[in-house]
Amino acid sequence: MRCPFCGHEDTQVKDSRPTDDGTAIRRRRSCTACMQRFTTVERVQLRELIVVKTDQRRVVFDRDKLTRSVQIALRKRPIDPDRIEKMITGIVRQLESSGETEIPSKLIGELVMQTLKEVDDVAYVRFASVYRNFSDAGDFQTFLGGQAASKESDESS
C-alpha cells in the first residue's frame, strides 16, 4: 500500500485486529522509507452500489461521504464514536442487503433520518434541515410541529 505521507510504495503491516463489531480489520502500518505510521481499515464489500441522484446522475456509493454527513449532524452531541460507526455499518448493510445495485439518494437520506431519529433528536433535526433543504425558521417550525404531532399519536396508541 502506498504511504499517504511520502507516496512510497512499500509499507509494512505492524498490527492487525478486528474492529469491535467484527465488520472490518484495522491495520497499523509503517512506511519503510519515511518511517511514518498510519492506520488502514479493510471491509468486505458485498457489491458495488450506485447512487441515483435526484437529477438521475449515477455515482458510486461513498461510505466516507455517508460517515461525514452523519458526523456533521452529530457534531458536539454526546454520542460515542463506536455507536456512530455501528449506525453507518447498519445503514450500509441495509443498502447492500436490499438486493439492488442502484440505490436512490432519497432512500439513503430516509435511512439516515430514521437512524438519527432513534439516536439523537437534535442530530435528526440538523440532518433533516440540510436533507430537506430548509430555507427559513418556518420550515423548522413546520417540521418540528409534524414531529410533535407524530410523537403524541405514538404515545396515545
Swiss-Prot record:
Positions annotated as zinc finger (unnamed): 3-34
Cofactor note: Binds 1 zinc ion.
Domain ATP-cone: from-to ranges: 49-139
InterPro entries assigned to the protein according to its UniProt record, in alphabetical order: ATP-cone_dom, NrdR-like_N, RNR_NrdR-like
PROSITE patterns found in the cross-reference section: ATP_CONE
GO biological process, one term: negative regulation of DNA-templated transcription
Residues annotated as transmembrane: none
Named cofactor requirement(s): Zn(2+)
Keyword vocabulary terms for this entry: ATP-binding, DNA-binding, Metal-binding, Nucleotide-binding, Repressor, Transcription, Transcription regulation, Zinc, Zinc-finger
GO molecular-function term, one example from the UniProt record: zinc ion binding
HAMAP family (alphabetical): NrdR (MF_00440)
Protein family (similarity comment): Belongs to the NrdR family.
UniProt function note: Negatively regulates transcription of bacterial ribonucleotide reductase nrd genes and operons by binding to NrdR-boxes.
Identification of the protein by name: Transcriptional repressor NrdR
Organism from which the protein derives: Granulibacter bethesdensis (strain ATCC BAA-1260 / CGDNIH1)
Lineage, opening ranks: Bacteria, Pseudomonadati, Pseudomonadota, Alphaproteobacteria, Acetobacterales
Gene this protein is translated from: nrdR
